């Protein structure tokens, strides 16, 4: 644009000069045009190098996310405005375009495909389960004290094989019909997700299969944990407390008056960075605070050992 205006000005100036019988050597005109072209080329090269430097360590998705979040942040770029234009936009600058909660949810949606199901799953060690051959009294006792809508059914010699899932409502209906509780007849097969499946793909599979429950398996086919549709939705909306007022370990974080934080070891790092600024390595093989500590220490952390994060007591070699 600037180059075109320069050409027009030079051509117009030469025509006006010729109209007043002033003779301007063409060599000066050509030199001015060549100089303008060279300056514009250097300007474009400088802008290209600057953009390449700023985006060298960022993927296209990350750059797009950052651009959208900058747009939604409500922080307008500084620009020189005349008095009339400034008076028109003065009132708009007093209020942000989006409130913080809206910006946070939009950012989570944009990052949805960069998180895998293993980062939000419930570990198999924390799964409420029941043996396929359990007596009816044990089933009733577990249903009475359990507040979940589904129970994972296990079998095998060591009761470690996850066979499927039973809906508590099915057990209730079976009981209302005065029938003996039969887990074998009620077991349903959930979806099976590889541990590296992106959340966006998991959400689509949940929608197509019309089920809200899935096993997460590793490359060897071993079940590492479970994930539900509610888990995926919590990555967008934040923690959704249940009726029994249980504190989900993945959202168990407390801010103290002295500025310190108490964080559950099961909390995903992607959720932690919403509260505590923390650089994350995209190539890391861990997803939780406990994984971060074990990667840093190369052993099970000890209670109260001073680090950048303070670890609370461990149970059975697991950071809690």
UniProtKB/Swiss-Prot annotation:
Position of the signal peptide: none
Location, primary (coarse class): membrane
Domain (CBS): residue spans on this chain: 121-183, 186-244
Transmembrane stretches, start-end: 4-24
Disulphide connectivity of cysteines: none
GO molecular function: flavin adenine dinucleotide binding
Keyword terms of this UniProt record: CBS domain, Cell membrane, Membrane, Repeat, Transmembrane, Transmembrane helix
InterPro entries found in the cross-reference section: CBS_dom, CBS_dom_sf, FAD-bd_PCMH-like_sf, FAD-bd_PCMH_sub2, Ion_transp-like_CBS, Transptr-assoc_dom
GO CC annotation terms, alphabetical: plasma membrane
Cross-referenced SUPFAM superfamilies: CBS-domain pair, FAD-binding/transporter-associated domain-like
Family to which the UniProt record says this protein belongs: Belongs to the UPF0053 family.
Name of the protein in its database record: UPF0053 protein in cps region
Organism: Klebsiella pneumoniae
């Amino acid at each position: 644009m600037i180059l075109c205006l320069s050409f027009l000005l030079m051509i117009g100036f030469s025509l006006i000069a010729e109209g007043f019988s002033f003779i301007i050597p063409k060599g000066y005109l050509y030199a001015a045009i060549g100089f303008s072209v060279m300056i514009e080329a250097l300007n474009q090269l400088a802008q290209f190098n600057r953009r390449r430097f700023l985006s060298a360590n960022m993927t296209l998705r990350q750059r797009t996310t950052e651009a959208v979040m900058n747009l939604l942040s409500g922080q307008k770029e500084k620009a020189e405005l005349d008095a009339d234009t400034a008076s028109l936009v003065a009132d708009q600058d007093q209020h942000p375009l989006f409130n913080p909660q809206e910006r946070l949810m939009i950012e989570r949606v944009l990052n949805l495909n960069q998180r895998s199901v293993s980062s939000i799953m419930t570990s198999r060690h924390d799964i409420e389960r029941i043996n396929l051959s359990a007596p009816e009294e044990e089933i009733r006792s577990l249903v009475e004290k359990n507040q979940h809508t589904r129970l994972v059914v296990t079998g095998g010699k060591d009761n470690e094989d996850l066979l499927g899932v039973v809906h508590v409502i099915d057990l209730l209906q079976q009981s209302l019909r005065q029938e003996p509780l039969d887990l074998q007849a009620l077991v349903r097969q959930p979806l099976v997700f590889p541990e590296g499946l992106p959340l966006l793909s998991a959400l689509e599979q949940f929608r197509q299969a019309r089920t809200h429950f899935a096993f997460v398996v590793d490359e060897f086919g071993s079940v590492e944990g479970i994930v539900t549709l509610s888990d995926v939705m919590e990555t967008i909306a934040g923690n959704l407390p249940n009726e029994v007022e249980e504190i989900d370990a993945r959202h168990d974080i407390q801010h103290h008056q002295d500025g310190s934080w108490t964080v559950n070891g099961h909390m995903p790092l992607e959720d932690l960075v919403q509260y505590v600024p923390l650089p994350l390595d995209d190539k890391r093989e861990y997803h939780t605070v406990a994984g971060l500590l074990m990667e840093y220490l190369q052993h099970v952390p000890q209670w109260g050992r001073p680090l950048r994060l303070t670890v609370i007591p461990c149970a059975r070699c697991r950071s809690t």
